């Protein structure tokens, strides 16, 4: 299984903080957002490689971060913009950066096209754990992988969201008693359930042809949830109910809130 990190956006809502620096590498305390996530995912036996799909502007910064946090050599003379993280886990699985060639927010490919680009560039023909690297998570992805193995289908995550206003800004799924996905809507004005879908997915090898041809068959390009919505309509999918919470870092306010709550 490949872990594919979607990190090609330009995080314009964070202003100057991410004008020349990728949001996934912003630190919450001693660790970056991405570092916290990979510390967990790297421990999953099924994962054999991490793939970071990013843009041309930020690709060198990710490469520098990987070198700083995987080399066993002294890092004291490295560029101070990306430093070795304290208590760093030396990742056991290789990390590959894929550069999508874009340099501005206006020319971005969109999350779905970025995933397809990485799949084509690396000739990925394996199960994929696809994640957005702008969340702090309070559970292990191992639980999600185990759930997908048990169901034998591609899977999404879900969590109960009581706020109608928040449901109107995200993907919402209808489920049966076995957590099989019956339907999915993106940003519905009238949500049909309280099950919200965060940007974490498992696409199994048997469904990769559907993924590869999704955009040419009408799938939206911009948000990773567009692909999940498309896949729900074309194959059997199940939804894993998150066993604990997450913290979405989508703005300057939420970034500083994350530092205050979790960066000590």
Where in this protein do the model-derived segments appear?
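Conserved catalytic core of nucleotide-sugar-dependent glycosyltransferases
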Residues: 165-181
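The conserved acidic donor/metal-binding loop of glycosyltransferases
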Residues: 133-136
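Catalytic-core segments of class I nucleotidyltransferases/pyrophosphorylases
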Residues: 145-146, 180-248, 252-264
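Short alpha-helical oligomerization interface
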Residues: 19-23
